[in-house]
Amino acid sequence: MSDNPYRRLLQNGGNPEVFRARGAVVYTVLGYIFCAGMLYTAFVDSNYSASANIALAAIIAFLSFSVFACIQRPSILFTDLGIGIKNPFSTIVLDWSDVNDLETKFVLTIDSKHGPIRCWAAVGPSRSQHRRIHPGDLREMQRGSLAIKAADSPKSDSGAAAHIARIRIDDRAKVRGEIIEHKWESHNISLIAYSITAFAALLGFFTL
């Protein structure tokens, strides 16, 4: 649709770059393969009763929905004019001029004029990743006298995304173009549908 702010940003924002978590594509494919295997077991090569098959179908629907919402969908769209964030049940678009600061500790969190925005596609490093990060990885990202945290390392999703964002923010003043209007769209229907499948999966689990 032409009035879709995210799509309009993708088409008109300039030099679009879509960021996803490392391994998101692999985990998405593996998740769907697992669900397909369960579906085959339940309905093609199965001796389960009809009620058990219905219960398995509810569980498969919940798992498939989870793979899509939590792994496949989350992404960050970087453009010259602004940023678009797709979280499991929301889509946010804003101009770089609306960004005040970036935090990378747990997930990439954008401190904006409209409030904090957390990006599911860019999580911070785990404890094991903290141990693998070498101080040399952070030298090129040193910003003046400010201390650089492990979460800012390009080896973490949050650090890599923040690095791209800072480059785009610095370049925004050089780019002429329309001001990107802030838009926060909550996908309540998807959230309700997900809650229903979760409840059905829970009931199905106890009926197996």
Description of each model-found segment:
Residues 48-52:
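Interfacial loop-to-helix junctions that mark the boundaries of transmembrane helices
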Residues 116-180:
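A membrane-cytosol interface segment of integral membrane proteins
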